[in-house]
């Protein structure tokens, strides 16, 4: 086993996945905001931190089909989250910037795939090359490109689909 494989295995043992609760709202909001700022500094901020917290508290957590969080096993710090909307839409998958490349995103994606009723679809901003590469590595295919008119940020995006 290489050092990289050993580090990934250790990372898996030190991280647990669980369903999100309303008590996770502030931590989920922080991950959402920090991840977007780090990965997509070009992205327009269309909502305040307070409005984002209210949206996660009153819309995302209580109305989504499933929301899972990844947390440090020892201290409980939230590292990332994923959201399934409806039967087949991966609505969000975000990780803290310091939690990347540890297999956590892959584990969250596996949870969502397991809960979906078949395949999955998702939108990714076209300029988010790291996210696009992640989903393509996991078997998603780009099926449509949009000019950004469908999202609040007016940022061109890509519709991806995955079938089991």
Model segments located where?
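A short helix-loop-beta-strand connector motif used in the catalytic cores of GNAT acetyltransferases and
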Residues: 57-69, 89
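Conserved acetyl-CoA-binding loop-helix of GNAT-fold acetyltransferases
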Residues: 101-114, 133, 137
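A short, internal acetyl-CoA/4′-phosphopantetheine-binding micro-motif in the GNAT/acyltransferase core
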Residues: 71, 90-100, 124-125
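Short glycine/proline-centered loop/turn elements that form peptide/ligand docking sites
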Residues: 105, 109, 127-131, 147-154
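Conserved GNAT acetyl-CoA-binding A-motif
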Residues: 115-127
